[in-house]
Each structure stands twice: as C-alpha cells, then as structure tokens.
Amino acid sequence: MVDLSTALIHGDDKDNRVTDVAPPINVSTTFRYDDDDLIPWTERENLDFMEKKPVYSRLAHPNSTRLESIFSEILDGYAVIYSSGLAAFYAAMVHYNPKKIFIGQSYHGVRAIANILTRNYGIEQHPLEDIEKCASEGDIVHLESPVNPYGTSSDIESLARRAHAKGALLIVDSTFASPPLQYAWNFGADIVLYSATKYFGGHSDLLSGVLVVKEEATSRQLKDDRIYLGTNVANLESFMLLRSLRTYEMRITKQSENATKLVRFLSDHQSEFDKVLKTIYHSSLQTEEFVKKQLVGGYGPVFAITLYTKEQCKQLPLKLKYFHHATSLGGIESLVEWRAMTDPYIDQTLIRVSVGCESANDLIKDLASALKELQDAA
C-alpha cells in the first residue's frame, strides 16, 4: 500500500476513462447501454458491471466509483459511499438488522434514527453499560470516538472485546479522527463509519458518508441495498468530494495541530478566565493510556468548552472574528457553535469549537480576546 498522500491523489487512477487530469463533473443520470454487452439483469451474476459501465446514477456513476476506490485504499477495507453520514448509519442498520442497539454518548442524529427504528420495528436501545447483561449474537454496539461534541476519546479495543464476547458487532464512527489520526480497524472495529461531509469534504459545501467493512461480499450487499434505499452520493457532490480528497491530508494535519495548540493555551490560561471558562474537553487533555495509542497521527480538530451562563454562550460567538457561528465541522474555516441551537440533548452552556486551517496564533488571540471581554463583564 502506498502512503496516504499518494493514495488520495492516485487511488482512482484505475477508474479513469478520460484524458482530463481533473475528474470531470458527470451530470448525466442515465447512460447508453454498451452494444457489445447486452446481458439482461437476471442473467448477471452480480451488479459489479455497473461500476465499469454505469447504467443509472442511483446505482453507480463514474465519480462515485472513483470515490469508493480511494476510500477503500486509504481506509484499508471495502468502502461504500452514501449521500450523508446518517444515510450510511441507516444503511448499516438496515443491513445488519439488529434486535438491540447499544449506544453511548453520540451524535443526536444517530439517536434520532435509533428512535425511529424503535418506534417502527421495536428495536431495543440500551446504554453501553448493559452489554454484558443484555447483548447477544447479531446485536450492534455503536461507538463514536472521539465523540461529538466533546472531542474526547473512548477505549475502542476494550469495547470491541466486550461486544465480541457477546457475539455483537462494533460500529465505530471515526468522523472526528479520520486517518491518519486514527485507524479504528486496529482496535477491533467490525464496521467503520465516517461523515465525509466533515474532514474528507473539508469545505462546508457537500454532504456524503462512508461505510467501510472487512468483507467484499458485505460491501456488495450494501451497494445492492443502496440502489433501493436511494442513498447513493449525487453527481456534483461526488465531483466536489474527489476534489477535496486530493488535499485532505494537508488539511487534517493542520487542523489537528491548530486544535491541540488552542486547547493547550486554554488549559494553561484557564485561571485568567475563571468567571467564564468552566470546563475544557479534548482528547489531548485525557491521561488514559489508550488515547495516545489510538490517536497515532494527532488529536482531533474538535473540542468543547462549557461556560458559566447561557448568556455568555450567546455572547462569545458575537465577539469572535475568525470563528463563524455555525453548526457542522471539518471545514477549512474555524467554527464555533452554541450547541444548544441544534442538539436537544446537550448541556446548554456548551460551546463546540471546530478548528480550521487559519494561523493558530491568530485563532488563539481571537479566542483569548473574546474570553477576556466576557471575563471583564462578569
């Protein structure tokens, strides 16, 4: 396997059928049949032919195939691309069809899907603490690490042992620390999930998701299911995601370094903002041994802080120059979000910080200035 930077640029070379150096935007939804390959659907052994000879873009199209080639190489498995991270999670639930789902702290959208499955099909939801007591063969254990919105890490290897001892499968959502920061396969994950909207996309202008599995047959079934779920990534988004992947390693490395510097500054100077800054959450502040073992390439670019009042949470974003007050994360621009705006389950004094590719020094000065204003007013 070549290095990450090379795979990001050349992992789809084998799928290239044009002389364009940059992949073209394929807007067609339908493609002419090959006159030399007129074989009825019922006589096909499988649907792999659509990746080389596309038929209809809901099934596959040139740039979705290129994306899956790159993701399969850089994520060391069989990748299936989707229209969003939540579409990828839902596809996993449809495919594995568990009777019980064990979920810890996680993105509220995942919880909403779990609630739909419970309401419609009676799937049981349990906390991670109940694995030993309640889990059985074929159940799903779902873990985010690092977790949204805190950016803190959980022990993947320990949870994998607990899940596998009961015959359950472990899905790890590694969106907040995609490679080269973390390789969830190495710690026992059975399925790895990413919202490609975030760091892989990296420009706050597309939606996509990826599931990565270990067996080719599983990926084939997921792709077949995707045809009828209608959740393939769209043509324009796939082109934009291909463009973004070329620079992904440079961006994620810079963002990781910046976030670690910001967290270190806040931790070192917390006493200067003692009327405002209550708590700082980030993997770099954790002392457990597993954290550095998992995050081999650096800490995630998201962290969270809690302030003392809701009013301070409203005011902080207004005082920042280089952080947009917006939801989502992973783009080259830094964002802050008073998380209560979009997450109904969260502490209403929590601010999530998604660190971009600006100068770390400028970001530190900006955040320090805003906190000082609130400190002086407290």
Swiss-Prot record:
Residues the record lists as N6-(pyridoxal phosphate)lysine modifications: 198
Biological process annotations from GO: transsulfuration
Any single GO molecular-function term of the entry would be: pyridoxal phosphate binding
**Keywords annotated in UniProt:** Lyase, Pyridoxal phosphate
Pfam family name, one:
Cys_Met_Meta_PP
Q: Where are the transmembrane segments?
A: none
InterPro entries per record: Cys/Met-Metab_PyrdxlP-dep_enz (IPR000277), Cys_met_metab_PP (IPR054542), PyrdxlP-dep_Trfase (IPR015424), PyrdxlP-dep_Trfase_major (IPR015421), PyrdxlP-dep_Trfase_small (IPR015422)
Give the highest taxon in the source lineage.
Eukaryota
Essential cofactor(s) = pyridoxal 5'-phosphate
Q: Give a Gene Ontology cellular component term annotated to this protein.
A: nucleus
Q: What else is known?
A: Present with 1360 molecules/cell in log phase SD medium.
PANTHER family (UniProt xref): CYSTATHIONINE GAMMA-SYNTHASE (AFU_ORTHOLOGUE AFUA_7G01590), TRANS-SULFURATION ENZYME FAMILY MEMBER
Name it. Uncharacterized trans-sulfuration enzyme YHR112C
Q: Which organism is it from?
A: Saccharomyces cerevisiae (strain ATCC 204508 / S288c) (Baker's yeast)
Lineage start: Eukaryota, Fungi, Dikarya, Ascomycota, Saccharomycotina
